[in-house]
Amino acid sequence: MIEIKKLAKKFAVENPKNLSEQEKQDPRLKGRFFHSVQDVSFVCKKGEVLGLLGPNGAGKTTTLRMLSTALKPDSGSVIIDGENVLAQPVIARKKIGFLSGSTGLYGRLTGRENIDYFGQLHGMNEKSIANRIQELADLLDMHSFLDRRSENFSTGMKQKTAIARAVVHSPELVILDEPTTGLDIMATQTVLEFIRGLKEQGTPVIFSTHHLDEVQELCDQVTVIDQGRTMFDGDIASFKALAEGSLHQSFMAAIQSTVSE
């Protein structure tokens, strides 16, 4: 189980004059600091998939980066199975698989070599890495491009390789930042099936998305954030109950509570 309590993160604004008019009007801009995440809390238990929703700029990516230990929060806590992630980030990274919004593959390496390299970073031996790559290639349908250099990969090939690289060490928690963005229908379904497989294994998955059909299909829990704050946190049934119509209406109902406050 992962439990997040009252996460907050601000960034210094080097030159306020360069901000857009929209950014200047954002209430999170306070003096020379932009408070990207102000108060985010949620829980994801074993075997659950949690969908993290919010408009562009809500603080979703910053939140996920803090969960992955890529960013250190200014305040708040991240607990995985009773262990404080922020106090022991090196140990925590071995338990976490993180897909960032940017694939960042090494272009001169093949797909296999990209995954292999991350396996080595996690201390896996050669045989274990080879077996795991074979397993992931089967699950993510990667065999046709696995041994090609990644600089020529399509968006779907890059994303599949990045996902495989993120989970090569069989992490206890998987965090995915918009894993299906830019993918075609077939690649999207492959990735969604992979997430479903993680769920069936009991691995908690937290992923951000703008696609509410993915939330409908996969998620047990939903967290909506806006302007860096948790506006809704509950199960999918409670989320649907926010409005009697579509999930889009439920999402808008959660976001509109920001305005009403």
Predicted regions located by residue number:
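ABC ATPase "signature
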Residues: 233-234
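Conserved ABC ATPase "signature" region
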Residues: 18-27, 116, 120, 127-145
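Conserved ABC ATPase signature
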Residues: 149-153
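Catalytic Walker B motif of ABC-type/P-loop ATPase nucleotide-binding domains
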Residues: 174-178
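Conserved ABC transporter NBD signature motif
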Residues: 76-87, 91-92
